[in-house]
Regions:
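A glycosyltransferase accessory/donor-loop signature
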Residues: 1-5, 11, 29, 33-37, ...
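Short, acidic, metal-binding catalytic loop of nucleotide-sugar glycosyltransferases
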Residues: 22-30
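Active-site-proximal specificity loops/subdomain of glycosyltransferases
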Residues: 32-65
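Short, P/G- and charge-enriched loop/turn segments at secondary-structure junctions
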Residues: 48-51, 114-119
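GT-A fold catalytic core of metal-dependent nucleotide-sugar glycosyltransferases
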Residues: 58-107, 131-138
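Extracellular structured ligand-interaction cores
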Residues: 60, 126-129, 181-183
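A gly/proline- and charged-residue-enriched helix-loop-helix capping module
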Residues: 100-112, 118, 124-126, 141
Length: 223
């Protein structure tokens, strides 16, 4: 089964459920989907004042959680899948530690949807979707994730550039979409936030939310 780890935040718990539902809906292969809940992972690092989510650092534990074997995907929870994730499973990882969408992203806003500071740094948003070759990411031990800087982790310092491959850009479109989009990422805030309820591409998330909630009704009625 293709392993997928979704970053989980207590403020956006339903977002993770909606993403999970959208992944399963469109997938032609079996998926093993897990949530990265910080309270269950044994990290002891103090909260970074610049981190905007509970999974800012937990994403880098994925190779450790996979015993540094096989492939796995990490995804932020503020996404909706519109394509078959098998396309990522089919990507060749020979000689690569990672594949990511290599954005050249420079946000215009100075703050995020929840009031956190919007920092700008090289390779911003590259770590929001990662296809990992876990056997080549032994650098990311639990101790390293617990102690290293955000700069070291999010910029993939210590990983040679030639070991960082690309994922097609259709698999992580930032706050927009078209007919080719496979995964939309509401990185500036989605319609679940009051201040973003009129997001120009929010309809995709609202539709996925309604489908997810509808999927719960038969079980609730039966109970």
């Amino acid at each position: 089964m293709f392993r997928i780890f979704i970053g989980w935040d207590s403020r956006e718990a339903e977002c993770a459920d909606i993403l999970r539902h959208s992944l399963i809906k469109h997938s032609s292969i079996p998926l093993d989907i897990r949530y990265l809940k910080i309270d269950e992972l044994g990290l002891h690092r103090p909260r970074d004042p610049l981190q905007s989510t509970e999974f800012t650092y937990t994403r880098f534990l994925v190779p450790h959680l996979c015993n540094f074997e096989g492939k796995a995907v990490f995804m932020d929870c503020d996404m909706v899948c519109l394509g078959d994730i098998k396309e990522l499973d089919d990507l060749d990882m020979t000689g690569l530690a990672l594949r990511v969408v290599q954005h050249d992203y420079k946000p215009e806003a100075t703050s995020k949807m929840d009031g956190c500071v919007q920092t700008v740094y090289p390779r911003k948003n590259w770590s929001s979707l990662m296809l990992m070759n876990c056997s080549m990411l032994k650098l990311w031990t639990k101790e390293v994730v617990d102690t290293q800087t955000g700069k070291f982790l999010h910029r993939f310092e210590g990983i040679p550039d030639e070991q960082i491959g690309e994922i097609p850009k259709t698999w992580n479109t930032l706050d927009w979409m078209d007919e080719n989009t496979k995964l939309i990422h509401y990185t500036s805030g989605g319609p679940w936030f009051e201040q973003c309820k009129d997001h120009p591409y929010g309809e995709a998330w609202l539709r996925a939310r309604d489908e997810y909630r509808a999927s719960l009704r038969p079980a609730a009625a039966f109970a």
